[in-house]
Amino acid sequence: MAEYSTQPATDPPVTGLRADLAACRLCTDRFAATATGHAPNPVVWFRPEARLLIISQAPGLRVHRANTPFWDRSGDRLRDWLGLDAATFYDRSRVAIVPMAFCFPGYDAKGGDLPPPPICARTWHAAILETLREVRLTLLIGGYAQKRYLGPAARGGVTRTVAAWRDHLPATLPLPHPSWRNTAWLNRNPWFAAELLPVLRARVAEVLETP
């Protein structure tokens, strides 16, 4: 498990919500039927004072085992994109991580992660987002988050959605998933590193440093 976990939220309603989410077992049968046959393990990472919100896809197997979000190579890349060290990234009073599914969904026949079960976001997101009233910037990572929170603006797929990033500033930025499987995508789209990343880093620094 990561060494950067901060103390849990002390606000009673938030503490209760976090406990309820951590105890969620809605997908027990679904996960038992996967190749890994694993039990649910929701990775819960938010506090109400967070200013940066990351809505991502779902934990991978390594994150499932560590019980810490982005505790993998994807996290290394994401932290580089954001210009954040691990201590800042894992400070729940500054950064909230609310994936489309809080548990590792298992693998598909090709060895890739299964999609996040829609029941997870339907069940938990509204209540969680209601507590995050200090958020100044939301990052929508990957197609599932973008379709849910951008609606028709995300119909063209991840590339077109991310290419239109200027349309969503200053409160939101769509990003591709930082998986190393997307290295080819990054090579095909050099504008991402040249144009979007400098703005992303500046905006993240602004929202985390402004009192």
Please provide the spans of the model-predicted regions:
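A polyanion-binding, active-site-adjacent surface
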Residues: 3-208
